[in-house]
Amino acid sequence: MAEQEPTAEQLAQIAAENEEDEHSVNYKPPAQKSIQEIQELDKDDESLRKYKEALLGRVAVSADPNVPNVVVTGLTLVCSSAPGPLELDLTGDLESFKKQSFVLKEGVEYRIKISFRVNREIVSGMKYIQHTYRKGVKIDKTDYMVGSYGPRAEEYEFLTPVEEAPKGMLARGSYSIKSRFTDDDKTDHLSWEWNLTIKKDWKD
């Protein structure tokens, strides 16, 4: 049986319903301080110095200035029932993702994992923003608060809450997703586009 494509009216209705779920928060970020400034504050207070060291680690602030402060390295769809890994290497050719598509079985539970590094300074209020399109119509916008992170050698990983893939005949098909990793200063650390195909089964 041929898949039934959603009409423009149905897509508009989905977009309107998702628009109602979006919430805006009046939040004013605090003034940004560098790692060096934080380390210099109350440096004669031994207990505070130890606390900051535990919080920030032994940070080397003389990192290569030519390397971006935040480097987003990968996106993974975490799904226990997937037959194989669903991963994007975000350090390579981002344009190639427009020609590929993840296959996700309808109705399964999954999470999105973003892997990233912070190289020099603390970054406040990082966010992962995702716009989802179907047949050129934006049907969903989701903002995930990632939080504030300081520099370290190891990668950080952020996991979104568990979500359920859409299901049903109208939900099956291709989706285009525009992703952006930003922060309180509205710095665009990385923007990329990728595709998702909802199918009745993993290998439909």
From Swiss-Prot:
Modified residues (N6-succinyllysine): 141
Residues bearing PTM N-acetylalanine: 2
Keyword Protease: no
GO annotation, biological process: negative regulation of apoptotic process; regulation of protein localization; regulation of Rho protein signal transduction; regulation of synaptic vesicle cycle; Rho protein signal transduction; semaphorin-plexin signaling pathway
Modification Phosphoserine occurs at: 34, 47
GO cellular component terms listed in the entry, alphabetical order: cytoskeleton; cytosol; extracellular exosome; immunological synapse; membrane; nucleus; Schaffer collateral - CA1 synapse
Mutagenesis / variant outcome for changing residue 45 to A: Loss of RHOA interaction
Cross-link (Glycyl lysine isopeptide (Lys-Gly) (interchain with G-Cter in SUMO1)): 138, 141
Keyword annotations: Acetylation, Cytoplasm, Disease variant, GTPase activation, Isopeptide bond, Phosphoprotein, Ubl conjugation
Region of interest called Disordered, as start-end residue ranges on this chain: 1-36
Covalent cross-link (Glycyl lysine isopeptide (Lys-Gly) (interchain with G-Cter in SUMO2)), residues: 138, 141
Effect seen on changing residue 185 to A: Loss of RHOA interaction
Top-level taxon: Eukaryota
InterPro entries the UniProt entry points to: Ig_E-set, Rho_GDI, RhoGDI_dom_sf
Modified residues (N6-acetyllysine): 43, 105, 127, 141, 178
GO molecular function, one term: Rho GDP-dissociation inhibitor activity
Subunit structure, interactors included: Monomer. Interacts with FER. Interacts with PLXNB3. Forms a heterodimer with RAC1. Interacts with RHOA, the affinity is increased by three orders of magnitude when RHOA is prenylated. Interacts with PSMD10; the interaction increases ARHGDIA association with RHOA, leading to ARHGDIA-mediated inactivation of RHOA and ROCK and prolonged AKT activation. Interacts with KANK2; the interaction is direct and may regulate the interaction of ARHGDIA with RHOA, RAC1 and CDC42. Interacts with RHOC. Interacts with CDC42. Interacts with NGFR (via death domain); NGFR binding decreases the affinity for RHOA.
Free-text function comment from the UniProt entry: Controls Rho proteins homeostasis. Regulates the GDP/GTP exchange reaction of the Rho proteins by inhibiting the dissociation of GDP from them, and the subsequent binding of GTP to them. Retains Rho proteins such as CDC42, RAC1 and RHOA in an inactive cytosolic pool, regulating their stability and protecting them from degradation. Actively involved in the recycling and distribution of activated Rho GTPases in the cell, mediates extraction from membranes of both inactive and activated molecules due its exceptionally high affinity for prenylated forms.
Family: Belongs to the Rho GDI family.
Known disease link: Nephrotic syndrome 8: A form of nephrotic syndrome, a renal disease clinically characterized by progressive renal failure, severe proteinuria, hypoalbuminemia, hyperlipidemia and edema. Kidney biopsies show diffuse mesangial sclerosis, with small glomeruli, hypercellularity, increased extracellular matrix, and contracted/collapsed glomerular tufts surrounded by immature or abnormal podocytes.
Protein name (record): Rho GDP-dissociation inhibitor 1
Annotated organism of origin: Homo sapiens
